[in-house]
Swiss-Prot record:
Residues 1-39 are annotated as: Disordered. It comes from Pseudotsuga menziesii. This is Unknown protein 24. It comes from the Eukaryota. Residues 18-31 have a biased composition (Low complexity).
């Protein structure tokens, strides 16, 4: 496959680039965390 166990850092970088900023922000701001804070 394209993704190989070469370097975790590189894999993460590729994922970050492929995933849109919107999705990245969503991942960082988990809904569960938000709910917990609101409660």
């Amino acid at each position: 496959g394209l993704i190989t166990q070469h370097e975790p850092e590189q894999s993460e970088n590729i994922m970050s680039t492929r995933i849109p900023s919107s999705f990245s922000s969503f991942r960082i701001s988990s809904p569960a965390d938000d709910d917990e804070k609101t409660e």
